[in-house]
Amino acid sequence: MRLTKQYANALLKSTSKEEAVAVYKELINVTDLFEQFPEYIGLIEFQTEEFETVRSIFAEKVENIVLNFLEVLAEDRLLSQLDTVIEDYRLVLVENNLLFEVKVYSSKPLSEGNQAQLVQIIESQWGSDYLIDYRVDPKTLGGIKLEVNGAVIDTTFRSRIDQIIREVQHGAKR
């Protein structure tokens, strides 16, 4: 297991299941801030005493667990790997079904109304902790295909046509 995933697992173990996704979202916000001020990463990573400055800046905006985790990364000189750690943390959340990755494939872009309906279905089935990615795939021929944490729900016409072909071929072999 790579080092960044070990840190991601340690972070998950130090949070409650209820807080785990909120911590992920806060880490994303922190990286957005670091992207605006990239010089801070190098400064913090090589002068860890400067972390108190970061702590005072983020104190009102970021949970202590996130600040503590960032400080550990800084002390271990891994802050420059923050994006990889966050990606590994996302994967750990998905593996533990605390965060749901939903990929929606359709033959054409879904209308806002269809997207809203789909979001309602997703939230009723899996809750509010999800990431959704809409993709256009002309091969679907209509309908939609959902992938949720690797599981596939395929209601596309292409899937139905393939099923009919298999049934006809199976029937012809009898």
Residue ranges and their predicted role:
Residues 1-174:
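Elongated, mostly alpha-helical coiled-coil "stalk/stator" tethers of large membrane protein machines
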